[in-house]
């Protein structure tokens, strides 16, 4: 994470857009057989990609969501690739840059597109009044919402499926099977759901007559009306009008036809065939060198084929081979796709029909059951290739053939990398730095008298009259492979101390370290990281007033923060009062999640949700806490929830009760703990367990280890008077801190519970409840917290009250 590459500095960038069937093969193979000097980056709108062959089985209820989706994050982690969770919206192939929806463009030396297809808009009302099957990565959720609507409606639901190809047939039968099963479970009559299938031509026109006849019989036996030779003219709310003029009542309309390519492919200037990227048999664009495409979004010149998953799967190996050849400067090889393929088409229940040439067999028979089992094994075997990764040992780095192909200037630059200087000789070059600063939209603040708009030896900042200056610093190495996201997290983390004090950050000085490498790669990495940081700074009204940059082994970023506040409004750790409510604004669990992510054990959706939380600034949260009279506050970071709560207890000469059952926890954190995965800082944090008065009672609770979990860019922990707590929590939730909740309470003592003076916290759960009684005060004793120099945690040299 944050390294150059596994085999030295980056020479060339290969970017894969989309996580389709072809690309998952390419991702794995570039991980199994690395090309030294090549950095592989996946740009994916969704971090979980569905396998189309198992989608009908999932709809029918035979597979879980996880069983039929490839999780792209563990796959990328295993292979050592970068993952950018965003959507491509254009390619500037002349300047070799990919334009993304929510962040700055990224460069490439070679790019491949495998993004599937999207619903067509040629039929009036289709986009507004139907549930589209394409793109398939979102259909599972759309189907579950549809199913919920049907099951909660007391009247009959009329479902119309539009599309008579194999996909529409499979989905119609799968949906009916699942819907009838769910109605039966709920004790409701089966006639609550009525199905029709509409197709412009005959049913399954590319399959043999015997297959069509078998499916017509199945439709008839299942009570599904089949409307052939009648296309859809318009779709409106509650009605599907056909080209014949017939109007079919439809409470739900499933659109499984007329899928189209994404418009930006043609808008980018690429050669297209009806909007699909036109590629030669090598899978390279016919007019843009270095641009490749595969799967449904591509059209191979001279080899037209149906839009089917089997062709995308088969394109994976030749695509991987030609991408390697292109990066090595070798001749590309033509690929001729197969003309026919064996279709194993499911019937909703666990039966299937085999369709090959003129051959057709199976159905609701023992043969059909056998074919289903065969299909099931084939599909699960394919999924297993991308869900279970082998252990790998990295080979010794060699002179990269990629560098040789790039020419003598690149080779000379690479030879200089091992002999990089220290001291000021380690600084990023002035020309690189100047270009990066020119590309950034640098935020300013009125209090900055001398900053980057008129650079000098130091920044000059005015402290407004009546205010005090608040200073803090944070720095750590990257724990994610995306410099843009890392820049956001790093600045949110650094500003957290300022917000926790109730101060307004006015300016920061950046300390940036980028991996050694060729000048273009160093520039781009520094730019992406600082673009992420300045995005957050602009959002919260804080200036980037200056900084320092250098080269090193890993990506790292920190900030010296200058803020201001009114002295009387400062929220100090020592400001708690007895009887106050403890409020936490963000969920915990980042330590175990990213420790698991490093091992390719964390699910992509867990990590994405965690990063969303970590990128959320606490500026608005701090304002709300001040408004509701919070007397004490801290940001929960490297020492974990317990460590920072103990700091507040010691500073306030109080004790606290912490409720495990009420802690907001990030999705997947408990699952990662069950795997025995914790942060490298966790053992040091656990040494503070002596501060827990009842640790022997509560340590068996599976949530208990999370109070020691080190957080990066964590939330605010604040003490608020009871009569203001509910209004404060509600305001925080409305401001976007959706998991905010009451997690405990402050006390002047822990009577009949604490047996040692350092026992400041009682941790309760459903089985162990604290009851306040007794007399006396808890004596404060300093508890030493040992630190370790790890990545995603608070800087070890941070001065605290510990």
List the predicted regions and their residue ranges.
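C-terminal auxiliary extensions adjacent to catalytic cores
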Residues: 10, 349-408
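FAD-binding core/adjacent interface of flavoenzyme oxidoreductases
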Residues: 2-11, 80-160, 187, 254
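FAD-site-proximal beta/loop scaffold in flavoenzymes
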Residues: 128-155, 238-241, 247-314
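Beta1-alpha1 glycine-rich phosphate/pyrophosphate-binding loop at the start
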Residues: 2-82, 120, 160, 166-209
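Short, well-ordered coil/turn residues at beta-beta hairpins
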Residues: 114-115, 123, 256-257, 294-297, ...
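Helix-biased detector of long, well-ordered alpha-helical tracts
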Residues: 401-802
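A Rossmann-like FAD-binding core segment of flavoenzymes
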Residues: 83-90, 177-281, 331
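A conserved FAD-binding loop/helix module that cradles the flavin
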Residues: 297-346
């Amino acid at each position: 994470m944050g390294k150059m590459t596994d085999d030295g500095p980056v020479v060339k960038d290969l970017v894969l857009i989309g996580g389709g069937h072809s690309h998952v093969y390419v991702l794995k193979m570039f991980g199994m057989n690395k090309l030294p000097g090549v950095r592989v980056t996946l740009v994916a709108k969704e971090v979980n990609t569905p396998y189309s062959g198992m989608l009908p089985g999932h709809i029918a209820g035979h597979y879980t969501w996880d069983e039929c989706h490839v999780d792209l994050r563990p796959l990328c982690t295993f292979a050592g690739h970068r993952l950018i969770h965003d959507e491509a919206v254009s390619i500037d192939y002349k300047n070799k840059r990919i334009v993304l929806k929510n962040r700055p463009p990224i460069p490439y030396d070679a790019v491949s597109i495998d993004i599937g297809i999207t619903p067509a808009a040629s039929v009036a009302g289709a986009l507004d009044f139907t549930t589209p099957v394409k793109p398939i990565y979102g259909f599972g959720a759309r189907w579950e919402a549809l199913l919920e609507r049907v099951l909660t409606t007391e009247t009959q639901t009329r479902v119309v499926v539009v599309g008579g190809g194999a996909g529409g047939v499979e989905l119609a039968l799968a949906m009916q099977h699942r819907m009838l099963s769910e109605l039966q479970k709920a004790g409701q009559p089966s006639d609550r759901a009525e199905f029709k299938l509409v197709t412009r031509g005959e049913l399954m026109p590319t399959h043999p007559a015997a297959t069509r006849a078998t499916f017509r019989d199945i439709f008839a036996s299942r009570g599904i009306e089949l409307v052939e030779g009648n296309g859809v003219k318009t779709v409106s709310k509650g009605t599907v009008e056909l080209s014949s003029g017939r109007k079919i009542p439809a409470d739900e309309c499933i659109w499984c036809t007329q899928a189209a390519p994404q418009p930006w492919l043609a808008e980018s200037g690429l050669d297209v065939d009806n909007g699909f990227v036109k590629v030669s048999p090598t899978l390279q664009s016919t007019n843009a060198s270095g641009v490749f495409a595969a799967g449904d979004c591509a059209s191979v010149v001279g080899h037209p084929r149906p839009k089917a998953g089997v062709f995308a799967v088969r394109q994976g190996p030749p695509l991987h081979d030609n991408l390697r050849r292109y990066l090595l400067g070798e001749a590309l090889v033509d690929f001729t796709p197969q003309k026919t393929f064996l279709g194993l088409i499911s019937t909703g229940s666990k039966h299937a029909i085999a369709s090959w040439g003129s051959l057709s067999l199976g159905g609701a028979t023992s043969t059909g059951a056998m074919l289903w089992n065969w299909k099931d094994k084939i599909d699960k075997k394919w999924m297993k290739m991308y869900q279970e990764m082998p252990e790998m040992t990295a080979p010794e780095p060699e002179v990269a053939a990629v560098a040789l192909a790039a020419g003598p200037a690149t080779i000379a630059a690479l030879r200089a990398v091992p002999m990089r200087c220290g001291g000021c000789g380690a600084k990023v070059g002035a020309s690189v730095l100047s270009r990066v600063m020119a590309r950034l939209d640098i935020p300013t603040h009125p209090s900055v008298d001398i900053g980057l708009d008129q650079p000098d030896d130091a920044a000059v900042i005015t402290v407004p009259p009546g205010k005090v200056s608040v200073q803090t610093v944070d720095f750590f190495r990257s724990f994610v492979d995306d410099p843009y996201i890392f820049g956001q997290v790093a600045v949110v983390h650094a500003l957290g101390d300022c917000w926790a004090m109730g101060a307004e950050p006015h300016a920061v000085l950046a300390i940036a370290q980028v991996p050694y490498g060729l000048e273009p790669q160093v520039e781009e990495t520094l730019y992406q990281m600082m673009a992420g940081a300045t995005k957050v700074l602009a959002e919260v009204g804080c200036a980037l007033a200056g900084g320092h940059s250098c080269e090193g082994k890993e990506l790292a970023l920190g900030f010296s923060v200058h803020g201001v506040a009114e002295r009387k409004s400062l929220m100090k750790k020592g400001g708690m009062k007895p009887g106050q409510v403890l409020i936490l604004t963000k969920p915990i669990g980042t330590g175990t999640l990213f420790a698991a992510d490093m091992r390719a054990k964390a699910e992509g959706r867990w990590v994405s949700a965690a990063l969303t939380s970590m990128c959320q600034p606490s500026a608005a949260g701090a304002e709300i806490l001040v408004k509701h009279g919070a007397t004490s506050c801290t940001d929960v970071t490297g020492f974990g929830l317990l460590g920072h709560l103990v700091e507040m207890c010691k500073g306030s000469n109080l004790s606290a009760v912490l409720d495990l059952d009420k802690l907001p926890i990030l999705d997947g954190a408990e699952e990662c703990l069950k795997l025995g995965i914790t942060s490298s800082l966790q053992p040091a944090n656990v040494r503070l367990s002596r501060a827990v008065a009842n640790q022997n009672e509560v340590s068996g609770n599976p949530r208990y280890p999370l109070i020691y979990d080190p957080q990066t860019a964590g939330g605010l922990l604040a003490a608020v008077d009871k009569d203001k707590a509910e209004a404060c929590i509600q305001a925080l939730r409305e401001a976007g801190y959706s998991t905010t909740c009451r997690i405990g309470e402050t006390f002047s003592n822990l009577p009949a519970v604490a047996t040692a003076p350092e026992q400041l916290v009682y941790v309760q759960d459903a089985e162990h409840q604290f009851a306040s009684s007794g007399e006396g005060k808890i004596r404060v004793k300093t508890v030493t917290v040992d630190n370790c120099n790890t990545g995603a945690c608070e800087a070890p040299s941070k001065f605290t009250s510990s």
